[in-house]
Amino acid sequence: MSERNDRKVYVGKVVSDKMDKTITVLVETYKTHKLYGKRVKYSKKYKTHDENNSAKLGDIVKIQETRPLSATKRFRLVEIVEESVII
């Protein structure tokens, strides 16, 4: 059980929900520049497994690392932190 707790957990925004049971999550992080010490924003997109197609475009979600589910999917949806408001 402790092995599962060592897996990476990220919070990001859903930028695509067009695929069946798959969402694309944009995760933004900050890293410090080695020479200048300035914080620089980095972003990366992760394909994430969404079993019930519950996450929608613009939602803030929590994802967790898991075993490879396909050629590009390595994460699964843990929870929807904040739902987006569609006007």
UniProtKB/Swiss-Prot annotation:
GO terms for biological process: translation. GO terms for cellular component: cytosolic small ribosomal subunit. InterPro entries: NA-bd_OB-fold, Ribosomal_uS17, Ribosomal_uS17_bact/chlr, Ribosomal_uS17_CS. The keyword DNA-binding does not apply. GO terms for molecular function: rRNA binding; structural constituent of ribosome. SUPFAM superfamilies: Nucleic acid-binding proteins. Pfam families: Ribosomal_S17. Keywords: Ribonucleoprotein, Ribosomal protein, RNA-binding, rRNA-binding. NCBIfam families: PRK05610.1, uS17_bact. One of the primary rRNA binding proteins, it binds specifically to the 5'-end of 16S ribosomal RNA. Part of the 30S ribosomal subunit. Belongs to the universal ribosomal protein uS17 family. This is Small ribosomal subunit protein uS17. The gene is rpsQ.
